[in-house]
Amino acid sequence: MTLTLTPGAATLAQLQDIWANNRAVTLCPSAHAGIKAAQALVAKAAAGDDAVYGVNTGFGKLASVKIAAKDVATLQRNLILSHCCGVGEPLDAATTRLMMVLKLLSLGRGASGVAMTTLEIIENMLARGVTPVIPSQGSVGASGDLAPLAHMAAAMIGEGEAVFEGTRMAAGDALRRAGITPIVLGAKEGLALINGTQFSTACALVGLWGAWRNAATCVLTCALSTDAIMGSTAPLQDAIHTLRGHAGQIAVARAQRALMAGSQIRESHVEGDTRVQDPYCIRCQPQVTGAAMDILHFAGRTLEIEANAVTDNPLVLVEDELIVSGGNFHAEPVGFAADQIAVAVSELGAIAQRRVALMVDPTLSFDLPPFLTPDPGLNSGLMIAEVTTAALMSENKHLANPCTTDSTPTSANQEDHVSMAAHAARRLLRMNANLNVILGVEAMCGAQGIEFRAPLETSAPLKAAMAVLRAHVPTIAEDRYMAPSIEAASALVANGTLAACVDLPAFVKGEAA
């Protein structure tokens, strides 16, 4: 199904649908008039004698070099080819397509001066499944994501590589097989295509969606862990959290309380429990996961604005009949958002790992067997699974260090402060993958611990979640080859199956709380 988007008004839900479901898109026809008006203004400037950056001049430090009218098309083509300097593993197809959609939205605002045919080829490539090969490294996030977007633009002119029908090939061949004619770039069009933050923003959005899913999963895995160690639900009382007032904290406490309602395990120790308080990793779950959710919402709002933004340079101001240079290509907002997401992901993993450590330690787990195995000594149980989570937690802590603070001058000091947003956003994929494993192992430990509490039963919602887990990860009755079980549990986190067990629809969908 083709989704019609209005430039400036795309929602995170629409963008997530496009990314997850391989949607084709088209721009709302109401955007066409503004696009054409801006292109006419650029054409007028290209035919004139005045130097206009990006239209009839060189680029960056070479902006003072005037280009003859007869060389304008060559200028744009040379720009694309010279900027195809990306390295590293290719960006995955879904994120590449999302990047193309974001570029379409930006150009569709009518402030870039490109021809309708340039937007139409992006629409056609999305509809017919021609996906440019985009090396994932090489952008410093100002002047936009130059290298990765140049590889996208190269495919549009029949250069570089693309994937079509599952096969990587020359982009010209891919376009031909899809029945698409490569475009010839007009004045400013090459610059409009590569100036922008769409690579960084696409990667950050994917990281955001993964973090939202993991935050919801964290509520479930903590509920399992809490019942496994016979923890208290008293700290989940609504009055505690409304007194503080943070929306995320309130929502997490309510959701976890609902997950644990009716647990026989919990009811068995409401009275007479010798423990006064649970460790922070149990007791402060709403405060930590709730804070993570709140910061994810803040980052999400930033990225939604950026997804609809014009981040080209120079900008075509049709009403004022001006083409003006600015700095909207600087991806600092995206870099900040990605750094915020990284901190949230790291903290979700840090507190979850402590719950795993709690459950496998017989001195802390309230009479659970060592390493959650029925025959400790002969069997090691989940001993090294916990060590794996510690390794991944530490890795994520390192990856959470801010990237935006690491600016370096480039391009002969013309571009002397950069955002590093691309790196900030890309590392989120690895961090979420690590967190998937930590939460998968926590789910395994929590379920195993609850089973040791028999004949007492957990709540109906947690039994349902355990049934989902047990369909893929059997109870660990004795030592076995563990890697497939960890992989299966992690997959249930990554694909959202466990998150779906939690009643946090607003957060899972990325809507305001």
Swiss-Prot record:
Database matches in PROSITE patterns: PAL_HISTIDASE
Subcellular location: Cytoplasm
Entry annotated with the keyword Lyase: yes
Single GO BP term: L-histidine catabolic process to glutamate and formate
Modification 2,3-didehydroalanine (Ser) occurs at: S143
Gene Ontology CC, one term: cytoplasm
Alphabetized InterPro entries for the sequence: Aromatic_Lyase, Fumarase/histidase_N, HutH, L-Aspartase-like, Phe/His_NH3-lyase_AS
Pathway: Amino-acid degradation; L-histidine degradation into L-glutamate; N-formimidoyl-L-glutamate from L-histidine: step 1/3
EC number: 4.3.1.3
Cross-link (5-imidazolinone (Ala-Gly)) at residue(s): A142-G144
Catalytic activity: L-histidine = trans-urocanate + NH4(+)
PANTHER family named in the record: HISTIDINE AMMONIA-LYASE (PTHR10362)
The name this protein goes by in its record: Histidine ammonia-lyase
Species assigned in the record: Roseobacter denitrificans (strain ATCC 33942 / OCh 114) (Erythrobacter sp. (strain OCh 114))
Origin organism lineage: Bacteria, Pseudomonadati, Pseudomonadota, Alphaproteobacteria, Rhodobacterales
